[in-house]
Amino acid sequence: MKAVMLLSGGIDSSTLLYYLLDGGYEVHALTFFYGQKHSKEIESAEKVAKAAKVRHLKVDISTIHDLISYGALTGEEEVPKAFYSEEVQRRTIVPNRNMILLSIAAGYAVKIGAKEVHYAAHLSDYSIYPDCRKEFVKALDTAVYLANIWTPVEVRAPFVDMTKADIVRLGLKLGVPYELTWSCYEGGDRPCLSCGTCLERTEAFLANGVKDPLLSDEEWKNAVKIYEEMRARNEGKSD
């Protein structure tokens, strides 16, 4: 069965790709450039798709940037160096992003005869990002069905009840090449290790008792140190 999926180049969507392949799907991966501050994840998506030997399309919709430019990922705000919290996550929201990307993916699915569109929304994103919630998935699935009633397409988020640590655990079993993925909100040569998504990534690999394969031994030691220091500082504030 054909399936279209959103592939960002991060660990969640890369795991989803390998999960779908393991399930016997013919995967068509879409990666979007919508005006992000850097292209590191897009480059990683290309590497992951090549390693998995799947059809991969990079779609430039950057002309919408001025319409949705907001916060730290597409706007002028600096990337916050802190664990995810309601305040931090609100600063990293791209308004209506998944609605836009999944709508395009659904149209592409109809074109190629795919019956499903998948994306890697998960439990760790659930509390703040509105377009990663079960309610959103269900509502968009209904909307896509109504919009394409003669050629029905389902919208699915198979990781919606999983944490990032759960996703990494699955990916390790599936042999996901995490060394090719990119999560950092910064666009440097190496991950900054201290933005919200870097900290969450470190936490996920720590929870599984393994080193992040993207990092050198020295970088991993530094990542764990930063994680533990910022976690202790964060817990101190809540006491």
Curated annotation (Swiss-Prot):
InterPro entries: QueC (IPR018317), Rossmann-like_a/b/a_fold (IPR014729). Pathway: Purine metabolism; 7-cyano-7-deazaguanine biosynthesis. ATP binds at residues 7-17. Binds 1 zinc ion per subunit. One of its GO terms (molecular function) is zinc ion binding. It catalyses: 7-carboxy-7-deazaguanine + NH4(+) + ATP = 7-cyano-7-deazaguanine + ADP + phosphate + H2O + H(+). Its cofactor is Zn(2+). Signal peptide: none annotated. Keywords: ATP-binding, Ligase, Metal-binding, Nucleotide-binding, Zinc. The keyword Methyltransferase does not apply. The keyword Cytoplasm does not apply. Zn(2+) binds at residues 184, 192, 195, 198. It is an enzyme of class 6 (ligase). It holds the Pfam family QueC. Transmembrane segments: none annotated. Its EC number is 6.3.4.20. NCBIfam families: 7-cyano-7-deazaguanine synthase QueC (TIGR00364). Catalyzes the ATP-dependent conversion of 7-carboxy-7-deazaguanine (CDG) to 7-cyano-7-deazaguanine (preQ(0)). HAMAP family: QueC. Belongs to the QueC family. PANTHER family: 7-CYANO-7-DEAZAGUANINE SYNTHASE (PTHR42914:SF1). This is 7-cyano-7-deazaguanine synthase. It comes from Archaeoglobus fulgidus (strain ATCC 49558 / DSM 4304 / JCM 9628 / NBRC 100126 / VC-16). The gene is queC.
